[in-house]
Amino acid sequence: MRDALFALLFSFICLSQATAQDPHFSQFYASPLTLNPALTGLFAGEGRISSTYRNQWQSISNPFTTGTVAFDTRALRRVFKEQNVFGLGGMALYDQSNNGGLRSRYLAFTAGYNQQLDKYGHHRLGIGFQASFVSKTIDYNKFLFSRQFTPIGFDPSLPTGEPRSTLNVNYPDMGTGILYSGISNTEQQWYIGASYYHITRPNESMTGGEAKLSPRTTIHAGYNFSANEMSKLYFSGLYMNSAISSEVMIGSIYQQYLNFYEKKSSVLAGVYYRHNESIIPYAGLESGDFQIGLSYDINISSLRTASQSRGGFELSLQYVFAKDPSKNAVPKCYNKF
């Protein structure tokens, strides 16, 4: 009985947090199209595939699972020549809590344009837009209700007493973003960007009422440089804010090349800190145009007791379809934000 009551309480905690904020990743730098639409197409290569999977709080029956896959490419090359970049992309995202009690599906299309500010393309100013379609469903069969408790324990076969087993809502959404980026002889790179989502404040109510989604603002920035001929250091941070939640993350990643001459393979290690919530160690491997990253959120928030101090496991994959480096509109350092 105690375990069932614990599961009931924690289910509603998770559901309230899931509806209070958008899906997000600890490896925000590995998911460009969810971070800022102005990043669309801004990389060295023909096309880019990126995917991230997140599994949070496994100790309480896996209430949070998020996955995304995205593709973007540089477009209209004959129109936007030299160092100016116009990119198009698409993204699909799936998010669920309480083993499917709340499910969210997102399908988004993005476009971004980055204009060089000097003759060498060392400084750029970009803007991006995102249009998406969102579908959300609540399945009452996945939750626990008081009518399902008996004197001898919990019986999931008993009816929930709810008039409907599922509720759902569908709506379009829009977002935009800006980005300033610069490089110095490809040895140093810096950037700062901002994105703004839920411009139209869509109505999320599943019962015919009004529950407008609060706009969300994201500010992100970073700086990286070559520590020596065989290594690089990356520093980045993020601030997200809406009417009902906020988040601050900062951290650093160290990259060590394994081959002095080609520098095609490397190992990466670092750590990030999410304010008042988690410490996030990171490890990664880069081989040619493929990169894999693994991180784990160590929970330090007020929920650490209920979650048994377990946080979120996250896996990111990225592959860039490369071409002749001499024909790239941007240097390879842009492949990491």
Region annotations inferred by a language model:
Residues M1-L5:
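Positively charged n-region of N-terminal signal peptides that target proteins for export
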Residues A7-C14:
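Bacterial N-terminal signal peptides
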Residues L15-A20:
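Sec/Tat signal peptide C-region and signal peptidase I cleavage site
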Residues Q21-F337:
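Subset of outer-membrane beta-barrel
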